[in-house]
Amino acid sequence: MTAARPRTRSAEGRWAVRVVLLVAGFALVLALLTGARRLGALPDLLRGSVAALVLFGVSGDALAVRLCPPALQPVRPVLALALGMAAGPLALTVLGILHIPLAVTLPLVLVAGLAASWWVRRRGGREAVAPLDVHVLVATAAVGVLLGCVVLIPMWGSGVVSVPGINPDAHQVVGSAALLQQAPPDATRVQLGLDHIPTVWGSKWPIFYALAAASNLSGLDPLGAFPTMAALLAVLAALGFGALAGEAFGLGRRGGLVVAAVSGLSWVTIHLAVHPYWNQLWGYAALPWALLLGWLALNGRGEARAAVGCGLLLLLIALAYPLLFPYPVVILVLMAVALRRRPRLPAWGRRGGPIGFVLLGLILLVPLLAAVQKLSQAGSQLIHPGGAVWGGDVTSFIPFGDFVGTGGGILPALVILALAVWALVRVVPRRLALALGAALALFALLDVRLRTVPSGTYMDFKHLAFTGSLVVALGATGAVSLLRHRRREAAVLGAVLLAAWGVGAMIRDRREFKEHWVQVPPELSEIRDWSRALPPGTSVRIDIPQSGVQLWAAYFLAEHPVDSIDPVLFTTYAHPPWGAIADYSLALRVIPLRALRRLGVTGPPIRENRQFVLRRIVVPPGNTLPPTASLRQVQP
């Protein structure tokens, strides 16, 4: 272990204050650089944040009291949020599969959570609830709030509470949440913006239920509840890596605050939240907490009860983002091998646990089978050398520097990697260091496989997002250990490295926010008002090229049959059917009328704003083409 200066309580308090002030300064400068100066969105952001915190906190509090290992007792409320992130959505999913409406299940889950919190405290007495470290909790909360504000920069800049970024995945997420507010997950409702959850998204019901529940609690549309829940997930990921560094890597809680700040301000965390990659973000948020609880259960510091929390988070990862599931499993297996120990459930878990898990598995059979299918497809692609792998919206290999938060090419990545190696050699407990080192070596080999084929760009991004986050946490651990070293030269080096990382992260994050603003501006959501003003039963042709904008336009026109002459094809998205026959045309304002006249569009605009225009379509006499517009979408 690296020699460090002994610290008094007051010195540790000053350390935490400095960390909070540095994060606040970073957030303020970044907000000024990106033009995020509008507070009009604040009331709705507060409503969405409170709703997400209530959902996770109430769902996870009793579990945190029951399962929290001694090492995490001082920051138990943070663990409650992490466990509630899994427990609440899973409970809603189980009840939803039984066709109980969300309007009933959400109050039921919250009341059950409150009752369970009261029961575990009453049953265990004072000794069941260890005292909290108020100073650490306040500092952790302050860092978390600041990191959340950074993730919400698109809202501060636009003054609008809506989905950020450019990834059309958000259309399917919001549509799925809106459907679950009114129907069970296997239902079809053609009058909604998304009439059916696509089969390829069949494992992700819990994370759609979470958004639907937050929307109900806050009174916001799922569009409005989306950014605050994404911000909370990003914050939980950052705090999870900080807790992992503080408790497992041996850095201490206040050193872990620095790691949390570094992780939360890194490009990967911000990019997942604002692009956004909703499914991947959920797995990413659960990853560090699963690793931490698994380590504490295996090494004996967390007792066997930590294994239950680890298993719950692994289940969430498997359903939310099946491709991530092998990563924590590989790391945990290597931990068990290094420690020469097998995971054990607590006595009460061994008595009723197997039966409970079997029942849970039977109820969740459909999403579990969808997750297994996804994993098997990915595995079959990887074992064929040179074979193609899944593609997506990443069409070129992203520079290594982005994955360690600094931007740039291989050089900054090598510096952070060197710090990570230093941490493994000098800071992290030996057996854990062996397990993590072996895991990183395996992940490096996998990256070589992905970079040997042109189609590997998308999966390489996914892979390095998870691997890089672990390297960042280890690298920050190494830098903090240098900063706290007895030798002045080492402390200066640590400070310089952290400052250089901060400058690089500031530049990269600024570029990220310039590229990702609000995906659904007011002009786009105004189409919903136009739809309500149209005569019932009339149809609309969406004359918008293939894009996420077309999908959102169809979402807002859900009350009317729609079609498109250029629908979004060859994706995992439900989309309007192909067709040219309709009563109205919705087009981009920049498209001149003369280009639309050959498609029957005529007359002055019925509705228009700065981006879109709605006009009548006049079908030529003698037309024999059948109607093509439909309320039912084409499933991928």
Over which residues does each language-model region extend?
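Alpha-helical transmembrane segments at the extracellular/periplasmic loop-to-helix junctions
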Residues: 48-58, 283, 360-370, 385-436, ...
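Transmembrane alpha-helical segments
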Residues: 320-324, 371, 446-450, 478, ...
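Short hydrophobic alpha-helices at membrane interfaces in multi-pass membrane enzymes
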Residues: 296-315
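Membrane-embedded, hydrophobic transmembrane alpha-helices
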Residues: 1-134
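Hydrophobic/aromatic-rich transmembrane helices and adjacent perimembrane loops
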Residues: 52-53, 169, 232, 280, ...
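Signature aromatic-anchored transmembrane alpha helix within multi-pass, membrane-resident enzymes
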Residues: 353-364, 430-433, 437, 477-506
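Short periplasmic/luminal acceptor-recognition loop of GT-C membrane glycosyltransferases, typified by
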Residues: 498-595
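Active-site lumenal/periplasmic loops and adjacent helix-entry segments of GT-C-fold
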Residues: 145-285, 456, 461
